[in-house]
């Protein structure tokens, strides 16, 4: 009997059969599972789904509706133990990519769960929309749907609202309401893994708030990637077809990012969650607690990523014998401090978790919000530390082919030897550090983490505005009043 949780083979077969409209390097892709730009990351994604059956006790749970095994990352946690179990499944997947896959399936699985359970916000417009969110969660869970999403509009004139643009039809907008659904047209950014998933979620920004004048652009829906009129226009691939030795990360985990074009796309009503209501869009992520559960996944993933960065740093230090230098230890300590701080945020978030009014065990958002605001600001420094410590060794890095060449192989092996490793091992390590921080893939990782939840400055403003400030101001006022009451004036005679 077929199980709802899919295998890697089933994931790839779905992509083959879907034949979504995917474009890259000026050509239309016939089959993403074999195209050089996608085939390796598709196999990395397939490995994630295979892991569900390799470790079913960690990666699967019984569906509350069918009793069959479904993905643990879809679970609605109702206890702290279940919350931790979901996080452990997230980190199991994260370790398979060293945290490099920012849009592994668990990220959007958490969003779909939260909005499907806390669906009454969508009913403010029409009870149908709440029912749609609930049904979509069950559908995604029971069919193990892989998802990409798009939250932002094209960068046109950021000084103007969407409806004030010179070409106001470029951003994705509502064209027509029909008895059976809606017609939408326009462009959205930035669909990571666009074209290599089953479906796409179109949702409002998590940070930028819309005005009532932007109601035609206020949409939330989910449709298959192969819906007529949908095109994924992918950026240049950073997987250049090189070996996993030369490009150990890019050759396996290059997710890709895409512009998504909607050309008079029909969306049936049962797939619509918000239609022309900027007020609901502005409140969607916070009032459903979706941002809390998504942040829980992100912090868990970033802990794994930081563990990997620390491991690379320590191996690099050991390889070239720089471990006794004062500044080297200090830089290593910086990464250790980031790791332990992130772990502390996660522990507090999980152990202070409380059930929300829908019965979902919800992590302490104060801890997660601090972590998700801080990590984008500190990640560039972590990458910088590796670059500083690697120094010229990250520039003079031969390829594996150089070691195999009969004339120069021995020269390279001798020239590249380290304190504790031979030349071959040292270059392999340094190529990893380079791909992590300096290659096109590595530079994209730094940029991606910096803007993960949106503009860090805009996020910081929102964090400041939402922070409970009064207790701290009152603390100071009471201190000053107390100081005044016990103050004894100096005796002028002395």
From Swiss-Prot:
One of its GO terms (molecular function) is 4-hydroxyphenylacetate 3-monooxygenase activity. It catalyses: 4-hydroxyphenylacetate + FADH2 + O2 = 3,4-dihydroxyphenylacetate + FAD + H2O + H(+). FAD binds at residues 149-151, 155-158, 192, 455-458. It comes from the Bacteria. Its EC number is 1.14.14.9. InterPro entries: Acyl-CoA_Oxase/DH_mid-dom_sf (IPR046373), AcylCo_DH-like_C (IPR036250), AcylCoA_DH/oxidase_NM_dom_sf (IPR009100), HpaB/PvcC/4-BUDH (IPR004925), HpaB/PvcC/4-BUDH_C (IPR024719), HpaB/PvcC/4-BUDH_N (IPR024674), HpaB_Deino-type (IPR012687). Utilizes FADH(2) supplied by HpaI, to catalyze the hydroxylation of 4-hydroxyphenylacetic acid, leading to the production of 3,4-dihydroxyphenylacetic acid (DHPA). PANTHER family: 4-HYDROXYPHENYLACETATE 3-MONOOXYGENASE-RELATED (PTHR36117:SF3). 4-HPA 3-monooxygenase consists of a reductase component HpaI and an oxygenase component HpaH. This is 4-hydroxyphenylacetate 3-monooxygenase oxygenase component. The gene is hpaH.
């Amino acid at each position: 009997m077929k199980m709802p949780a899919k295998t890697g083979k089933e994931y790839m077969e779905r992509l083959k059969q879907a034949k979504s409209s995917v474009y890259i390097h000026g050509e239309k892709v016939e089959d993403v599972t074999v195209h050089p730009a996608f085939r390796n990351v598709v196999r990395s994604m397939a490995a994630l789904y295979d892991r569900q059956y390799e470790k079913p006790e960690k990666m699967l749970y019984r569906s509350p509706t069918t009793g069959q095994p479904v993905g643990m990352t879809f679970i609605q946690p109702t206890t702290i133990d279940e919350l931790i179990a979901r996080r452990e499944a997230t980190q199991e997947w994260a370790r398979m990519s060293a945290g490099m896959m920012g849009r592994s399936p668990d990220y959007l699985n958490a969003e779909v769960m939260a909005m499907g359970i806390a669906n009454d916000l969508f009913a403010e417009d029409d009870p149908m929309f709440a029912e749609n969110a609930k049904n979509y969660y069950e559908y995604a869970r029971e069919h193990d749907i892989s998802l990409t999403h798009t939250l932002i509009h094209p960068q046109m004139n950021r000084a103007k609202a969407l409806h004030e643009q010179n070409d106001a039809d470029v951003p994705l907008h509502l064209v027509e309401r029909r008895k059976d659904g809606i017609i939408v047209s326009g462009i959205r950014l930035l669909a990571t893994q666009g074209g290599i998933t089953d479906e796409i979620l179109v949702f409002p920004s998590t940070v930028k708030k819309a005005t009532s004048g932007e109601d035609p652009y206020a949409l939330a829906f989910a449709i298959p990637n192969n819906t007529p009129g949908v095109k994924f226009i992918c950026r240049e691939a950073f997987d250049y077809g090189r070996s996993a030795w030369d490009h150990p990360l890019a050759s396996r985990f290059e997710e890709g990012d895409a512009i998504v074009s909607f050309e008079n796309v029909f969306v049936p009503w049962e797939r619509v969650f918000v239609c022309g209501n900027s007020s609901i869009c502005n409140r969607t992520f916070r009032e459903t607690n979706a941002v809390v559960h998504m942040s829980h996944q992100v912090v868990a993933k970033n802990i794994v990523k930081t563990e990997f960065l620390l491991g690379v740093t320590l191996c690099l230090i050991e390889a070239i014998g720089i471990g006794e230098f004062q500044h080297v230890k200090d830089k290593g300590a910086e990464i250790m401090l980031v790791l332990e701080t992130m772990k502390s945020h996660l522990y507090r978030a999980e152990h202070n978790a409380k059930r929300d009014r829908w019965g979902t065990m919800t992590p302490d958002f104060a801890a997660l919000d601090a972590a998700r605001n801080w990590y984008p600001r500190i990640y560039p420094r972590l990458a910088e530390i590796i670059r500083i410590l690697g120094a010229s060794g990250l520039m003079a890095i031969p390829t594996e082919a150089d070691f195999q060449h009969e004339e120069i192989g021995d020269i390279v092996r001798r020239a590249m030897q380290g304190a504790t490793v031979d030349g071959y091992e040292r270059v392999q390590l340094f190529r990893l550090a380079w791909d992590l921080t300096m290659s096109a893939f590595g530079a994209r990782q730094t940029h991606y983490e910096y803007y993960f939840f949106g503009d860090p400055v805009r996020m910081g403003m929102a964090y400041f505005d939402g922070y409970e400030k009064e207790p701290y101001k009152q603390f100071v006022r009471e201190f000053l009043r107390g100081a005044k009451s016990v103050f004894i004036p100096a005796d002028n005679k002395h």
